[in-house]
């Protein structure tokens, strides 16, 4: 401080934690079980990862599905498609089957999912209002030559 140091902080929130919608997960698990057998379906439940899908799950019913067929570290330089049939074809069949399940019977399953518990934010405007509130910059320490001020 004696040399006139200042500390300026810029705080920007990262991605939100992913929260897979429970109702959508139940429908997807049922569809996947019919497609590949229930013994091949894992419901990982809640995870600690934060991702752009986490942001979406704040305002929309969301589900981040992982389908086998690759090996290596996700997003790593050793990530490779090792089973194109499972990775590409089974994945596409799963997505289409899930859409069909949600839309059949006048979209009964989709309506049930949409009637689930409240989301973290009622709409995207409320979400962005919070993000803007967290996104800020300020001088944490300011020294005017005689005194230092610390702001929290």
List the predicted regions and their residue ranges.
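Metal-dependent amide/peptide-bond hydrolase catalytic core
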Residues: 1-152
């Amino acid at each position: 401080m004696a040399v006139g140091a200042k500390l300026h902080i810029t705080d920007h929130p990262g991605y939100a934690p992913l929260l897979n919608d429970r109702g959508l997960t139940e429908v997807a698990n049922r569809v996947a079980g019919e497609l590949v057998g229930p013994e091949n379906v894992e419901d990982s439940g809640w995870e600690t990862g934060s991702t752009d899908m986490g942001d979406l799950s704040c305002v929309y019913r969301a589900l981040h599905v992982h389908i086998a067929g690759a090996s290596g570290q996700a997003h790593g330089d050793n990530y490779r498609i090792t089973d194109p049939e499972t990775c590409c074809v089974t994945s596409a069949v799963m997505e289409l089957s899930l859409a069909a399940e949600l839309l059949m019977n006048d979209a009964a399953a989709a309506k049930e999912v949409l009637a689930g518990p409240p989301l973290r934010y009622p709409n995207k405007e409320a979400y962005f209002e919070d993000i803007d509130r967290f996104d800020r910059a300020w001088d944490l320490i300011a020294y005017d030559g005689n005194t230092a001020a610390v702001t929290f």
